[in-house]
Structures are given as C-alpha cells and as structure tokens.
Amino acid sequence: MKPKQPKQSLHDRLRAARNELSRRDFLSQAALLTGALPAVGYLSHFDTAPASAMQSTAAKAQANIQGKIASLRNRVISAEWEISPKGLRLIRVKDGTSGQTIGEQGPAFALLIRGDSGEVVSSAMKLIGSPRVEMLEANPAASRFCERVNGRAVSATLEDVRHRVRVYWRAILRDGSHYIRQEIALEAIAGDLPVDRITLMDLSGRGPEVAGSVKGSPITRGNWFFGLEHPLSASKVEGNRATCSINRHLPLAHGKTATYSSVIGVTDTGQLRRGFLRYIERERAHPYRTFLHYNSWFDLGYFTPYDQTGALGVINAFGRELREKRGVVLDSFLFDDGWDDHNSLWKFNSGFPHGFAPLRTDAAKYGAAPGIWLSPWGGYDGPRKQRLAYGKLHGFEESSDGFVLSGPRYFRRFHEVCMDMVRKYGVNQFKFDGTADTSTVYPGSKFNSDFDAMISLIEDLRAAEKNLYVNLTSGTYPSPFWLRYADSTWRGGEDDSFTGVGSDRQQWITYRDAATHEHVVRSGPLYPLNSLMLHGLIYARHAKRLDTDTGHDFPSEVHSYFGTGTQLQEMYITPSLLLGPDWDVLAEAASWSRRNADILVDTHWIGGDPAKLEVYGWASWSPRGGIITLRNPNKVPQTYALDVQSAFELPEGAAESYSARSPWKNAVGTPSVKLRARDTRIINLKPFEVLTLEATPR
C-alpha cells in the first residue's frame, strides 16, 4: 500500500508547496507530501519524521512582545494580546491561511469569587513585573507528543486589585501546531479563596455550536474549535456568545495553586474532525498505539477469585498460540476482578503468594507485562459488598456510590497500591472501573471530586512509567479531554448484551456497535473512536450465550472489531475454546491492525444506526491509503452507497482514485474494486456480512 518513493527531495517538494499555497491549508498539504515517509506510529499522516511540516519554517512557532502587544504565530495560526499595567486582554486570533479573524474579544480569562458582585476579569487586573517570551525546549523522552517538539510561549503575572489571587498566565504555541493553548495557574495569596468558577473562553461571533451533549464537549465555529481542556468543563452557546468554564467546589487554599487550560485551533475547510483529532493526538497523555491484550473477565474469574496457576496458564496459552506460533505482538495480560482478597483493601488473595512477580516473568517471555483491574468505588455485586464492609470497619471513606477516591484515607491507600503495582510488579496497564461523585466534595479532601482525585493519581502513575496504558471505564463519557489523562474511556451501555437479529454473536456485535453509535457517535461527535473501550472480543466460558460459536460468526466479530480502529484491543477469551482456524483469524486481524495503525488512528463512523439494522461501519485515511469496514446487521441483503470523497473525508490535494481489495487470506484472488472520489459505488452486502477494504491510491 506504500506509494513509490518520489524522485524529488522532500525538502524541495515542501518548499514548492509553500510557494504555491494560497487558500490551501499548509498542514494538510504537507501531510500529503510526507505520506511516503516511514510512519512514526500514531501520527503518521499528521506528523512524520525526520522532516515534515511540523519541522518546517512555515510551521515554526514565533513569539514577540513589542510595547503592550504580545503575539504568537506561525503560518497557520496567530494570536495577539494587549498586556499593560491595567491588565491582559485578547485582541484577536487569526487563521493564517484564509485570513479569517476572530475579532477583538476582551478578557483572556475571568474568575467568579464567592461573595463578589461580579467577575474578576484579566483586563482589570494589575500586571506584576514584565511580560516574557519563553523558549520551550523539546523533550524527546516525553510521553505527550507535543512536548517532544520545540515551542514558544508568552507569559505574564497578574493580581486582582484586592490582592487576593495571583494568576500566572501563559499562551503556548508548539512548532507545527494549528492551535494555541492558554494556561493559568491560580494562587491564593491572602488566605483561602472561594473561587467558584473559572472562564477561559468567552468569544463572540456568528454560528458557534457545542459539539456534543456531554460535559467537556468542545465548541466549534466553522473551521475553528475551542475548549476548556477538562472533562468536567461546561461549554455553552447563547446566541452568538460561546463560553467555556469550569466550577470549583473547594476554596483555593492559601499558598496553593490550581492550573487550568484551554485551546483555540483552526482547521482546513471540511477537515474539522481530522484537524481536531490531530490536536488530540499531539496533546493527549500518550499518543495512539495498538494495545493487544488478554482480559481474565468471563474466563478465569466472573465475580469469583482465581489464582496464580490459572493466570500463568492463560499467559502461556496465549503466548504459544499468538506469539510463538503466529508471530503476533502481545502487549499485556490484564487480570480483572478476582485477584484480590475481598476482606482486605486491594491486597492479593492467597492464590498469589508472590503477588504478580511470577506473572511478570512469564509475560516477559512473550514481550508483554501484566495489567490490573482496580475499582475506585469498590467493584460490583458480592465482592463489592465484602470490600465495602471491610473498608467501613477500618475507617475508609464511603458514600452511597461506594468508596470515595477523594477521601484522604482511601486515596492514600489506593495510591499506594497502584504505585506498588508499577514499581514492584511491572504492571503496564490499569483498568480503573468505576469513579463517582463528580461534583461532590468529601469533607477534609484536597480534591474537588473523585474525578479530580483520579486525575491526580494518573499523573503520578505516568510520572513513574511514561508508557503506562490507562483505561477509565464506568463513570466516563465521550469528552475528548479525558484523553489528556487516560488512554481510553468506556463506550457506554452494558458490558455485553444482545439486540437485533441473527445468532447470539451477531446480536452481540450489533449491540456493541449500537451502544457506540448512541453514546459516542451521537453524544460526542469529536471524541476519537480510536480511544474507546468497546468490551473487546468475547468468547469465554463464563460469557452467557458467547461461550460457543455454533454459527461460525467469530471471524465477523474479529474483523468488525479491529475495523473499529480502537487501540484498546481486549481479548475476553478462554484459550481452550478456540480452534486452530479461530487463532488464525485472530492473529491475522491483530497483526493487520498493528501494521495499519497509521491509518486506523483516523477511524470515524460511516453509515447508519446498527439499532435500526442499517448498514454501518468505519473509515480511516492517510496519504498512503484508506480502510473501509462495512457491516450488514440484518438477515436480508442490503446495499451501501460508497463515495470515498465523503467516506474518507478527503482533504484538498489528496489522491482521488483508489484500488480496493480485502486484506484477508480467504479473499486472495478476489478482484479489486475501483473507487473514485465523487463517484458512488454500490456495495452489495449479504446478510451479516462484514466487508473490509484496503484502498491504495492509484
């Protein structure tokens, strides 16, 4: 699928493109030009190495302070602020390609302090010292991609006129960015300060929309996107006014600081989703990576304890079948509910006399490591009741929802357990299942909510191990800003259920995807589908109605699952239930997914609603090719009208003609399908058919 290497040097091609650009977005074009280079994992068609638009002069960040005016700019985006003894004011933000400007706006931020008659606005605060230009040096070892590139910032320190709060403000532009971030750190300087609300975006202009129905949804306006980078933030549009704010429930303690951030970015015409995704991939806690792993739920344990012998058995079974026999890369073996002693607080049961040390040793033979399930609120059903009873007896904080992670005593214990898992047992993955009390403060807590406590915990864990995979499940929702902390969140709905028609397995697939459509595609349209926990592949002894495959539908589940592009690739599988052909299908699809991660990172929804038995699927694109996965959830044949222009959301300058064929071995010899942008191709799908097409530019 890789195009031929160009004869002209990349440097010359980029330079020629810059000279020719007028209304064409520079970054989109540069991505096309760099598509022939080897992919760098997750960001292949966003940022490629060693040379790309990200490192070009045109996308290099510049900062300047001249008189009262501070500015950040590159060829893609620029912003100006007025910083004077009277305060800080945003003047304008400009799209460097189209010249479109978001006009004079006013304060850069505002604080609502309890008891005040109005807000403390940045434009009426006292400037302390002089504004500064900062050089941001790249850290090649950083987990977050944006920190691996250089950048510039402008900063200033301000105080309110009553000398209660000091604000350390800065605006940041990294090389290659099509967005500018704003950060503020609040410090209470005269005593505890009851800050009720922080507003970091207050913009006026025609046509803003909140892109989602959940907390932490961004705002869009034409080709622009805005947001306060926190999953508990509130985005509101009233007429032509758009605001992004977040509430605090605890006073800011004297001498302590609290940091908040926002983003404003611009994309090329018709590329809003992809442009926002590019921002997410650069700023998320860890960029996209396929993470294939076994999960013990439905297999070793199902509300029941298990032991070291069983755990070692599945590690070696999967290692033999996938790694040794079929060359599949395995990342982790996650041990779900059942490893702990319920009459303790997250201590190993007697079946693990050496903790996970033996599991770590055996997993390492296959290039993997152990992962672990922990439930901040205490788990479910019988085991939950036992844990909560023990916790109550020993003074750990609880509420009607279970354990309170923000409770001082429980947080210390939970934090200690998690850090030990990383340091002592080499755990490379956490499945945190169940966080509540998103807007409740526990007496004596230093956190605004359990979610704030979880964010603090995750930051500490990532400081200990930068490549850690963190999956937040129950309690999350499709705010893209979760990904500043976690790698994936829950799709919503039940773990497993059945809807539609066909065999049990076909109904499970339909349910899985209908839940995704309802809870994510419709509720959080800019949330990356590549970062969902879908509840994996299920073929396990304790999975009711999914412990057999009498209809031979396992290949359909496998092909549709890997077609979703999700990086959290879970296998809820009892190895003894799989036959040789099942392992073959699983291995082929898993390896295909890893090879094509640079394309699948772009996965987005196409088609209709699975709950209505409409044809649906996923599409993804990069300059080197595209992938389409379609599924017919009905018992009768259906058709799908495919136009790669809309399916791939092709940017200007992209290849328009493609040759498409199935990548699977059982389709070898099948004629290729010719696809062309703006030409509709009718795809005929048999009942329950899953069709995967790899499209190569021609």
Which stretches of residues belong to each language-model region?
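Active-site-adjacent "subsite" loops/lids of carbohydrate-active enzymes
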Residues: Y302, G371-Y425
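Active-site-proximal substrate-binding groove within the catalytic cores of carbohydrate-active enzymes
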Residues: G255, M454-V668, I682-N684, E689-T692
